[in-house]
């Protein structure tokens, strides 16, 4: 594993505020590689994964243009931990290898990785990437449920199902180098990010 760049992972559960944190980090001029973005790329028609997903989950995950419909796929797997695990097995290695390529191409000596499900894929990440620090964004469960309802127009039960499909990172904060608590406003969160970057002298 050859790598002479500083890598900081930013992760967090759904509706924790992770994307807002990473957006602010970008605004401060840092490189952020978003693993969700890379996931979009590997789902494109013609990729090996495209055909594997159809074999595994059926053609009902396709839209009218025969593209993978991520909303349909998400709805399918989030209702079953078995199917979610299968999706992760199919996608994670491919995603991480693409991230490694991106890291090598970047000229910056400091790179942030935005990863939704970091703890679930940590062993795989550590196999290919030398992570120097990991930061987690957390928020109270009830607050996250309300954010999902407001943001995605989901009902309460659907929001709870989404949250229950993930490990609760709030219970794992001792495993992280930095914890960013996001229970109030977006402006408060941005201020916390700025203060953390200043404290780290990045």
Model-assigned labels for residue ranges:
Residues 10:
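Hydrophobic anchor at the beta1->P-loop junction of P-loop NTPases
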Residues 13, 25:
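P-loop (Walker A) phosphate-binding loop of NTP-binding proteins
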Residues 16:
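ATP-binding Walker
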Residues 19:
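Walker A/P-loop
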Residues 27-35, 47-48:
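Post-Walker A helix-loop "phosphate-sensing" segment adjacent to the P-loop in P-loop NTPases
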Residues 37-109:
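ATP-dependent small-molecule kinase phosphotransfer cores
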Residues 95-99, 107, 124-127, 150-199:
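Small-molecule kinase domains that catalyze NTP-dependent phosphoryl transfer to phosphate-bearing small molecules
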Residues 98-105, 113-147:
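ATP-dependent NMP and nucleoside kinases share a basic, alpha-helical "lid"
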